[in-house]
């Protein structure tokens, strides 16, 4: 007990007086500070804010987890037909007459996406759909009369496109911002970037990297070179001045030079990509129209990107062969022909010519002669005689009768309207006589 009493005495001496007086009766040199307390209302406000933030976070997670319609479903698309080696045979327009070919993100050269982000929205992966600093900069430049600066992010540009928003007014800009937040809440960054690359304007009636690469460079987006990728990266910012019929103008060259400087700042090892290395660009008028009959057939059966089995060199050879034969036999009245070349091992079509001239209406050139229905006629006769030989019904020197004969209600005639009497099987086949052929057919038994 004495021990606890001594401890209490020591503790009493160490603690300052509760009355505020010192041990000697003077004013205390220090006071024990009161325990801080928060106002009741402030505590409730913090709780409510935390609850609202948590609820918003959970709502965003649930919204992202819900199944969403693919962004690709926002439009209709072109179709592209390629040969076996990837050569473009045909690029069609979409139902709205736009060249727009949906190309998955993984089939777009990575340098294209990187260049687009460096030029259009370098903070894309970090902002929530809107870049406040860029918007403030753009607004300041607009109201101060300076050169206008773009403040729209990739997400905002995509929202304007797919929701058809007029962002030139303040109300429209607010709608665009809200739509960008809505997109970011529902789709991943990669989904949004993929959709932007497929909907970005490239001048005239060209939309998206997939269609632009085929029109301007006649190659798929996966095969673009660095200069070509940098070219496509700068067109969407001002498609009227840099794309379409104006491709290759000073406006495009200037923008491409700026883009090259930005790129080289991060990738100095990629030199040279200056103005003298600018890629040659084509127009939509130069799009190929190869193997038209085959392309038409494939387009009736499918859409999107279609890969044919034909070989361009074989196709060109077959087309030349048909053209030469028609020219050689023109005096004989032959004006049209069709042919198909099939690999006997794989049964793949390697070349197909449906007519002598697809654009010649006098010969119904757009009709695919390879698929046209026709009577087999005399083409069956060799098979009839061959089967008769196999079954022992006759041999080449067997004498047959070429005379008026009725086979039930059917009385065949010959192409020349005449009958020549007794004839060997060999001569009957060589001279394509109809009555002997039908006579042989009646002797055949059904093959096992």
What are these model-derived regions, one by one?
Residues 65-113:
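Terminal hydrophobic membrane-targeting helix
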Residues 87-101, 211, 241-244, 298-301, ...:
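Short pre-catalytic segments that frame enzyme active sites
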Residues 110-111, 127-145, 271-289, 310-313, ...:
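Acidic helix-start/capping segments at beta-turn-to-alpha-helix junctions
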Residues 154, 162-163, 169, 173, ...:
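Active-site-adjacent helix/loop patches that line small-molecule binding or acyl-intermediate pockets
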Residues 2-14, 45-84, 123:
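N-terminal type II signal-anchor transmembrane helix
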Residues 20-22, 43:
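Glycine-biased, low-complexity coil/linker segments
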Residues 107-139, 364-386:
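Active/ligand-binding-proximal structured segments within catalytic/core domains
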Residues 60, 147, 151-316, 413, ...:
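Non-catalytic, structured segments within soluble enzyme domains
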């Amino acid at each position: 007990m004495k021990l606890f009493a001594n401890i209490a005495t020591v503790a009493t001496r160490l603690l300052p007086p509760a009355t505020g007086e010192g041990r000697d009766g003077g004013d205390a040199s220090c006071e024990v500070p009161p325990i801080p307390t928060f106002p009741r209302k402030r505590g409730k406000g913090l709780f409510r804010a935390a609850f609202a933030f948590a609820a918003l976070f959970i709502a965003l997670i649930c919204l992202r987890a819900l199944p969403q319609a693919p962004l690709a479903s926002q439009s209709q698309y072109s179709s592209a037909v390629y040969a076996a080696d990837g050569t473009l045979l045909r690029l069609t327009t979409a139902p709205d007459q736009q060249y727009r070919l949906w190309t998955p993100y993984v089939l777009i050269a990575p340098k294209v996406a990187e260049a687009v982000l460096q030029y259009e929205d370098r903070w894309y992966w970090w902002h929530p759909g809107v870049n406040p600093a860029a918007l403030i900069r753009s607004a300041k430049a607009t109201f101060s009369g300076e050169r206008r600066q773009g403040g729209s992010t990739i997400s905002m540009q995509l929202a304007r496109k797919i929701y058809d928003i007029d962002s030139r007014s303040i109300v429209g800009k607010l709608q665009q911002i809200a739509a960008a937040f809505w997109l970011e809440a529902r789709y991943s960054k990669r989904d949004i970037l993929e959709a932007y690359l497929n909907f970005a304007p490239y001048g005239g009636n060209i939309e998206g990297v997939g269609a632009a690469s085929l029109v301007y460079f006649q190659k798929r987006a996966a095969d673009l070179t660095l200069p070509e990728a940098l070219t496509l990266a700068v067109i969407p910012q001002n498609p009227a001045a840099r794309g379409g019929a104006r491709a290759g103008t000073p406006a495009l060259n200037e923008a491409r030079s700026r883009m090259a400087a930005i790129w080289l700042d991060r990738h100095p090892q990629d030199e040279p990509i200056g103005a003298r290395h600018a890629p040659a660009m084509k127009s939509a008028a130069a799009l190929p129209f190869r193997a038209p009959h085959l392309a038409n057939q494939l387009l009736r059966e499918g859409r999107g990107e279609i890969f044919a089995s034909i070989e361009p060199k074989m196709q060109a050879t077959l087309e030349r062969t048909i053209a030469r034969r028609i020219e050689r036999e023109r005096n004989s009245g032959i004006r049209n022909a069709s042919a198909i070349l099939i690999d006997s091992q794989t049964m793949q079509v390697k070349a197909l010519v449906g007519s002598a001239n697809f654009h010649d209406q006098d010969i119904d050139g757009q009709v695919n002669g390879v698929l046209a229905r026709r009577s087999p006629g005399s083409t069956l006769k060799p098979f009839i005689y061959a089967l008769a030989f196999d079954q022992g019904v006759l041999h080449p020197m067997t004498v047959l009768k070429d005379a008026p004969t009725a086979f039930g209600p059917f009385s065949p005639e010959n192409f020349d309207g005449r009958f020549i009497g007794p004839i060997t099987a060999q001569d009957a086949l060589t001279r394509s006589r109809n009555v002997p052929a039908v006579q042989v057919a009646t002797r055949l038994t059904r093959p096992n």
